[in-house]
Amino acid sequence: MGKGKPRGLNSARKLRVHRRNNRWAENNYKKRLLGTAFKSSPFGGSSHAKGIVLEKLGIESKQPNSAIRKCVRVQLIKNGKKVTAFVPNDGCLNFVDENDEVLLAGFGRKGKAKGDIPGVRFKVVKVSGVSLLALWKEKKEKPRS
C-alpha cells in the first residue's frame, strides 16, 4: 500500500527524483547551490579579508560570564562592509590603532558568533602586515608608518 521506497528494477528514476527534491532540505546543499556564501557573508566566500580599523570597542560578554571583550570595528577594503572583529590575547588591543590595516579571519562556527561574544564573527590575525601573535610574543615589532 505505498509503504517505503520503491525497490523494483525500474525504480531508478523515481529514487533519483525523490533524492533530488529532498536534498533541498539539507542546509549545506542549499547554501552551496544558491551561492549564499558569496551573496550574504561580508568576506564574499573567502577565508580572510583586509580592512581598515574605524574604532576600538569593548563588548560585554553574555550571561553567565562577566567581562568586556576587546573588539575593533573594521571596514573591509574589498566591498566597504563594516564588521566587528575580536582582538585575541591579553593586551593585544594596544598593538591595534585606528586607521591601521588589519587582516581578519573567521572566528567561531560556520559563520556564527563564538562563545559569549554576541554578534562578533571575525578575529584579527595581522596588523600592518605583521602577525598579532608575533607582536604579542615580542618576536616582531609593528612597522612605523
Curated annotation (Swiss-Prot):
BP GO annotations: maintenance of translational fidelity; maturation of SSU-rRNA from tricistronic rRNA transcript (SSU-rRNA, 5.8S rRNA, LSU-rRNA); regulation of translational fidelity; translation
Where does the record say this protein resides? Cytoplasm
Q: Which GO terms describe its molecular function?
A: structural constituent of ribosome
Q: Does the keyword Transferase apply?
A: no
**Assembly description:** Component of the small ribosomal subunit (SSU). Mature yeast ribosomes consist of a small (40S) and a large (60S) subunit. The 40S small subunit contains 1 molecule of ribosomal RNA (18S rRNA) and 33 different proteins (encoded by 57 genes). The large 60S subunit contains 3 rRNA molecules (25S, 5.8S and 5S rRNA) and 46 different proteins (encoded by 81 genes).
Q: What else is known?
A: Present with 10600 molecules/cell in log phase SD medium.
What's the protein name?
Answer: Small ribosomal subunit protein uS12A
Q: Which organism is it from?
A: Saccharomyces cerevisiae (strain ATCC 204508 / S288c) (Baker's yeast)
Its lineage opens with:
Eukaryota, Fungi, Dikarya, Ascomycota, Saccharomycotina
